[in-house]
Amino acid sequence: MFSTIVDLILPPRCGGCHLAGSWLCEICLRRMRRLEQPLCRRCGAELESPRGGCGCRGRLRSLTRLRSAVAYEGPVESAIQRFKYQGWRRLASPLATLIAERVLVEGLAASMVVAVPLHRDRERQRGFNQAELLAHELRRRTGLRAPPGRLLRIRTTAPQVGNDRLHRWQNVKGAFEWRGPQLSGRSVIVVDDVATTGATLEACASALNEGGAGPVIGVTVARVRI
């Protein structure tokens, strides 16, 4: 509650550098590094060479594509930390704009937008779900709608930070469930703040596929290079 009040009454300050005037200043926006080609056509990871591979095909079975706007470093890392852990909710708008630009550039088509859910206990503790704020703003920018049901995190999972690749996948396997009418082959964009291995987005895509979804595309603000 306190963070919400502070967010409403304080003037905008850049989430990247704390400069007053806007939630993301032009200098920080220019400093954010867009992911560079060559990229994996499936998961969007940066590759060493056009002929290289990242090995994602054996892991991403439900997620059709994964795309991130920028690299998780510098100003965007600071902004996401403030957004996620310090309650700077107004950052949802400029961060979602970065996602929307990537969706447009990539020509990513879908029928609806859904957020990666938090478990209810963690959302109660934090006070909000940062991915839902991003998804809401992305819907506003794209005109896509929310789904006719809910994607739920049905069990608590340990934070992914610090886990190696194997434990990330094991941690979220079976952690999500679609509750609502059958999605009848409709395509879905799933939104999160940061992607590392894509394990969380893949687990969400699996649950959506079980609910009848067609292609599921994961999008995030930033991507961690591993």
Identify the role of each PLM range.
Residues M1-I226:
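Glycine-rich phosphate/pyrophosphate-handling loop used in enzymes and phosphotransfer proteins
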